[in-house]
Amino acid sequence: MTKKYALAILAIPILILSAFKPAQNPAPKPELKWYGWNEGYAKAVKEGKIVLVDAYTDWCGWCKKMDRDTYTNPNIIKKINEHFIPIKFNPEIKDVTYNIDDKSFKPEELYQMLTNGNATGFPTTYFIFTKKMSLQLEPGYKDSVSFNALLDAAIAESKK
């Protein structure tokens, strides 16, 4: 009987102390905020950042893989959030108008302008350097390692 009381007496302080243990909240997971064209392009011009355009379609399996594998990488997210304004662009969406400065474009017109008339397939990543008003494109799926190198090259290009 005394062993039960002794055990209870030892257990009570342990339970009380564990109740006051500070919560260990994990660090918040970094998130990538995607913009629509009109908001994102204007923001990039205003802030002097690089526009990163992810051209995709709803039926594109490689686009979905890139969303799932590449754009969820914490290092990629951090780099994009710091140096770029990311924009999702689906040229197959209808009844939308995209603005660049004082001009308006239909989705297929913007796509033709981005590709310079040479369709590249999906996904394609476009880097628009707003300070120089120049454009680079990189067609196809990119894993985190190769995409990180692309981001570094775009950042270096923007500083020239």
Which positions does each model-derived feature cover?
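Short active-site neighborhood of thiol/selenol oxidoreductases, capturing the structured segment around
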Residues: 47-61, 86
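Sec-dependent signal peptide cleavage junction
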Residues: 21-32, 160
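Bacterial Sec-dependent N-terminal signal peptides
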Residues: 1-26
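Short, low-complexity, Pro/Ser/Thr/Gly-rich segments in the mature regions of secreted, periplasmic
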Residues: 155-159
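Thioredoxin-like thiol-disulfide oxidoreductase module
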Residues: 74-77, 81-135, 139-146, 153-154
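Soluble non-cytosolic domains of exported or imported proteins
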Residues: 35, 54, 70, 141-145
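A short beta-strand-turn-helix
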Residues: 32-50, 80
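Detector for the c-type heme attachment site
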Residues: 64-68
